[in-house]
Amino acid sequence: MDKVLFLLFVLSLGVSSQPITDSQRLFSIAVSRVQHLHLLAQRLFTDFESSLQIEEQRQLNKIFLQDFCNSDYIISPIDKHETQRSSVLKLLSISYRLIESWEFPSRSLYGGSAQRYQISPKLSELMRGIQLLIKANQDGAEMFSDGVVPQLAPYGNYYQSLGEDESLRRSYELLACFKKDMHKVETYLTVAKCRLSPEANCTL
């Protein structure tokens, strides 16, 4: 199924007679895929939380609110108003960077869920789809290549620095951050897609 959807990305770019329709098709696939990942992230986080004691949930949530995610190093809109003012290319570039930041951490999600739900391959396919959208929306700008998005801040290897004795906290934060970032990407891609319809109301 993943290969079929990715093929649709490629075939859609090859049709030049209806550029708006093609872009909408590309965006529809990308939005659908990130919605699936967001729902999956929510389910995994909820399942993990339900396995904890109430006091554990409270303490972990308190720590998480004071901590940060790996992706916080990536410059992104601070609120819905800035999101709506951002260009399509900027939203696509940030979305790519957010998905890319999970290439390594996604392999360590709780309970072997990454392998069971094929999360890493799904992220990789979404990255390739977003890359195609970036190329299609550059309009003569420098081509996007080698997985590098300009004007985005670097990020650290935060998840690699946690010790084994912090495995519970690590699992909680990984799932919470994964859920948060998939929500961000879903929002950015949805707004970017909406921009292709001049008469649409893209208010968040």
From Swiss-Prot:
Subcellular location: Secreted
Binding-site list for Zn(2+): 36, 186
GO cellular component: a single term: extracellular space
UniProt key word Signal: yes
Signal sequence interval, chain numbering: 1-17
One of the GO BP terms on file: positive regulation of receptor signaling pathway via JAK-STAT
Domain of life where this protein originates: Eukaryota
Family: Belongs to the somatotropin/prolactin family.
Modification type Pyrrolidone carboxylic acid: residues: 18
Matching InterPro entries: 4_helix_cytokine-like_core, Somatotropin, Somatotropin/Prolactin, Somatotropin_CS
Pfam families linked: Hormone_1 (PF00103)
Intrachain disulfide bonds: 69-177, 194-202
Keywords: Disulfide bond, Hormone, Metal-binding, Pyrrolidone carboxylic acid, Secreted, Signal, Zinc
Role noted for this protein: Growth hormone plays an important role in growth control and is involved in the regulation of several anabolic processes. Implicated as an osmoregulatory substance important for seawater adaptation.
Main location: secreted
Protein name: Somatotropin
Entry's Gene Ontology molecular function annotations: growth hormone activity; growth hormone receptor binding; metal ion binding
